[in-house]
């Protein structure tokens, strides 16, 4: 029935969202976050999801309480919280931490399954039992707690499966849901923490939820603050037991529950848990007892208050974000329903004594100042008083809106905000006003600079405010605007508060961004350091587990020894009783002696037979003696052979000594040769070194000579070329003069000869350049000039001239050209 009712509550929450948006929400209700989660008192098996309200910024606290739309404001505020939580889950550092935690949880469950499979269970049985059982949060070794819980579930079988056990579809769903539940649990006990901070605490504490509540990341107060808190805490100590209205809080022994693992939302059962009831109440009233602790010698108090009944709709087919959103929607619907007048039902509280201290009671010498950047959680100042009219214990004279723990006679505990306590007590008493005593750290935080925890809680409230601003960006909607004056005219105190707070939105958003960047950087650095130190931490934990295992084995051995001693005593008693029985038996044996005599006669007959067998054995012995004599002859032969072998051994030993002497001589000679070789090698190295130096000098000299020779060769080549050019010019000049002389003589003779013979006169453009009478017929290659006749070409070639007379180019080939003469 509880599953169906919770599903209907969530569906009802989704249907009433449109109605909630139609109402005007007061700024006081907007300032509140993480409202207390309530449970239906008509459901006996359902437990509440108790949550402490975070600390608000002083500047954002409204002065007047508008109670007209209280329940509607709470629902709207929870919708804003849903969006804020989805934003926190989308943070990249949150995703990185989520991957690390998921991998650690998955490894933890796989190790559990491996151990259980080694015990003889099948894979299906182990997977079903692990996915059905909830994670234990007590003790130091989380793996052993899960193994013990799963073993108990496997032993009980289907009979042990209650209504609170649900089977997941696969192991990954179990890991995802377990991670979300652990983070939600930490945020319920520590409401000032964000999702990233809760993940970081789980990672630092190796998935131990109890250690995450009291993580060292909170920082420790300094010695001066400790002395102030002790002096202030002394004022809030409970009065003496003689006061009938203020009985002593219940005393519990934390050692009695140390070895007992705890489930989510459960406390160990102690006999002192019933001492919180008051004897002066009527049967019609439920008497509430306040369970609190003074501030002497301790820094803070943690309550592990969780819901034992999980949201079933989140069990299957949901991601972590959907689980968190559905969880918030369920809480919104509960607040909307129970604000109309239904009662409160708190989480089951069996014994809160051992968890009030949470191992935080330490001597003042152990408190060391921590880094100022660590977040300091607000201490809970305590004082126990009995409100006779209301029938419950509450803390009085509190200046801040710190949570109040109320415990009724049935053992249920509820964490109420200060305002809820005031309003509830006013309704019951009619005139008596209940106030709360602030703790030492709260008084100091009012008069000093705001601590890091206040900044952190302020940054969270600013983040929530920024998310709500994205949902409703028009802050002035519904406020009348005066066009003449150019200002908004507030109609009530709510509008005045809106007009005052809207200008601060940008500043708060900038401050939120700065804090977010700083926190992300610190998370990244701390994650890197944790990943570096994680192997060493695991090794230390393993050593601690081995030491604990050794102690357990030693204790088991002592128990076994005691058992053996008791068994030996028991055996000794049995031996004495058996001795008495033996005396009684002796008489009976005398009666049986006669029977034995008869048997002895039969034995004599057997002795005769044995004598015969002895004779046969004697004959075999004689034969053996004969064999021994023959073996003695063989022994003598073997001894002679052994003597000869020994002589050979002595000869060989002499040869060995000679060989050793020769070896020593050879070794001495070898040693001398080695020394000589060392000297020669040293001389050779010196010679090599000298040769290398000489070679280097020779190379340098050779390079110098080569350079000088190259410069001389270049100089001589240039002179040769210059002289060759001069020689060629002189040859050309001599050839030219010779040719001119030849021209003069031959031209006249040829001209006269042509005239006498009647030959045609050669054209001027076809005349030879040397004789000026014959036709050009020789072609020079490669310049292709045709300037000489055949005879002049022969003369030109005989004189050794290789330059063309026209272009002065080198002649490689001479070709005689023949032309057809026209008739």
Swiss-Prot record:
SUPFAM superfamilies per UniProt: RING/U-box
Positions of the UniProt region annotated as Disordered: 24-72, 224-291, 432-464
Pathway it works in: Protein modification; protein ubiquitination
Ranges annotated as biased composition (Polar residues): 61-72, 267-282
EC number(s) per entry: 2.3.2.27
Pfam families from the UniProt entry: PIR2-like_helical (PF20235), zf-C3HC4_3 (PF13920)
UniProt keywords, alphabetically: Coiled coil, Metal-binding, Transferase, Ubl conjugation pathway, Zinc, Zinc-finger
Coiled coil regions in record: 536-738
InterPro entries: PIR2-like, PIR2-like_helical, Znf_RING, Znf_RING/FYVE/PHD
Biased composition range(s): Low complexity: 224-240
Amino-acid biosynthesis is among the record's keywords: no
A GO MF label: transferase activity
Protein name (Swiss-Prot/TrEMBL): Putative E3 ubiquitin-protein ligase RF4
Organism: Arabidopsis thaliana (Mouse-ear cress)
Lineage, highest ranks first: Eukaryota, Viridiplantae, Streptophyta, Embryophyta, Tracheophyta
Encoding gene (name): RF4
């Amino acid at each position: 029935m509880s599953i169906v009712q919770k599903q209907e509550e969530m569906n009802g929450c989704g249907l009433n969202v449109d109605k909630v948006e139609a109402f005007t929400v007061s700024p006081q209700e907007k300032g509140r976050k993480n409202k207390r989660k309530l449970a239906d008192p008509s459901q006996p098996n359902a437990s509440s999801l108790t949550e402490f309200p975070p600390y608000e910024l002083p500047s954002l606290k409204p002065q007047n309480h508008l109670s007209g739309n209280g329940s509607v404001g709470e629902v709207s505020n929870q919708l804003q919280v849903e969006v804020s939580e989805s934003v926190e889950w989308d943070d990249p550092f949150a995703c990185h931490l989520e991957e690390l935690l998921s991998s650690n949880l998955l490894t933890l469950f796989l190790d559990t399954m491996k151990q259980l499979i080694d015990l003889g269970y099948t894979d299906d049985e182990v997977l079903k039992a692990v996915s059905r059982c909830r994670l234990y949060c007590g003790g130091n070794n989380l793996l052993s707690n899960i193994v013990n819980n799963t073993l108990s579930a496997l032993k009980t079988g289907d009979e042990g499966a209650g209504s609170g056990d649900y089977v997941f579809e696969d192991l990954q769903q179990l890991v995802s849901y377990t991670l979300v539940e652990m983070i939600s649990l930490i945020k319920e006990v520590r409401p000032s923490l964000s999702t990233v901070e809760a993940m970081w605490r789980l990672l630092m504490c190796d998935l131990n939820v109890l250690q995450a509540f009291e993580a060292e990341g909170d920082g420790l107060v300094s010695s001066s603050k400790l002395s102030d808190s002790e002096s202030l805490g002394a004022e809030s100590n409970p009065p003496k037991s003689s006061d009938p209205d203020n009985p002593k809080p219940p005393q519990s022994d934390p050692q009695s529950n140390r070895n007992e693992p705890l489930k989510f939302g459960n406390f160990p059962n102690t006999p002192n848990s019933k001492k919180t009831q008051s004897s002066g109440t009527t049967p019609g009233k439920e008497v509430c007892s306040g369970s609190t602790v003074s501030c002497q010698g301790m820094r803070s108090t943690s309550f592990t208050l969780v819901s034992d009944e999980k949201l079933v709709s989140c069990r299957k087919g949901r991601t972590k974000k959907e689980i968190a959103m559905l969880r918030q929607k369920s809480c919104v619907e509960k607040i909307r329903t129970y604000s109309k007048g239904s009662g409160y039902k708190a989480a089951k509280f069996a014994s809160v004594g051992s968890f009030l201290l949470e191992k935080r009671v330490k001597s003042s010498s152990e408190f060391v100042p921590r880094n100022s950047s660590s977040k300091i959680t607000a201490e809970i100042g305590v004082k126990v008083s009995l409100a006779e009219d209301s029938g419950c214990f509450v803390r009085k004279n509190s200046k801040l809106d710190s949570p109040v723990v109320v415990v009724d006679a049935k053992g249920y505990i509820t964490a109420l905000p200060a305002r809820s306590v005031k309003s509830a007590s006013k309704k019951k008493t009619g005139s008596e006003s209940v106030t709360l005593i602030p703790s030492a750290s709260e008084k100091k935080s009012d008069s000093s600079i705001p601590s890091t925890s206040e900044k952190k809680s302020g940054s969270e409230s600013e983040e929530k405010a920024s998310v709500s601003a994205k949902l409703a960006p028009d802050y002035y909607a519904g406020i009348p605007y005066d066009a003449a004056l150019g200002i908004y005219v507030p109609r009530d105190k709510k509008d005045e508060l809106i007009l005052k707070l809207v200008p601060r939105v940008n500043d708060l958003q900038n401050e939120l961004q700065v804090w977010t960047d700083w926190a992300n950087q610190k998370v990244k650095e701390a994650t890197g350091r944790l990943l570096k130190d994680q192997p060493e931490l695991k090794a230390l934990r393993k050593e601690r587990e081995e030491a604990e295992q050794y102690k357990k084995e030693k204790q088991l051995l002592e128990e076994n020894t005691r058992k053996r001693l008791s068994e030996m005593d028991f055996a000794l008693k049995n031996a004495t009783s058996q001795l008495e029985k033996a005396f009684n038996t002796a008489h009976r044996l005398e009666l049986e002696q006669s029977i034995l005599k008869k048997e002895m006669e039969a034995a004599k007959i057997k002795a005769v037979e044995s004598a015969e067998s002895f004779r046969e054995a004697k004959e075999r012995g004689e034969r053996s003696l004969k064999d021994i004599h023959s073996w003695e002859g063989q022994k003598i032969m073997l001894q002679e052979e052994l003597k000869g072998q020994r002589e050979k051994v002595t000869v060989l030993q002499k040869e060995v000594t000679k060989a050793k002497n020769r070896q020593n001589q050879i070794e001495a000679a070898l040693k001398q040769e080695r020394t000589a070789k060392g000297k020669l090698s040293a001389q050779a190295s010196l010679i090599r070194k000298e040769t290398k130096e000489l070679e280097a000098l020779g190379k340098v000299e050779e390079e110098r000579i080569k350079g000088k020779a190259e410069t001389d060769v270049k100089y001589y080549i240039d002179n040769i070329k210059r002289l060759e050019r001069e020689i060629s010019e002189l040859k050309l000049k001599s050839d030219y003069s010779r040719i001119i002389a030849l021209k003069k003589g031959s031209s006249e003779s040829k001209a006269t000869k042509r005239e006498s013979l009647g030959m045609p006169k050669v054209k001027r453009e076809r005349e030879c350049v040397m004789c000026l009478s014959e036709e050009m017929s020789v072609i020079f290659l490669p310049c292709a000039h045709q300037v000489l006749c055949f005879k002049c070409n022969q003369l030109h070639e005989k004189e050794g001239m290789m330059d063309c007379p026209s272009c002065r180019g080198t002649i490689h080939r001479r070709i005689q050209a023949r032309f057809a003469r026209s008739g």
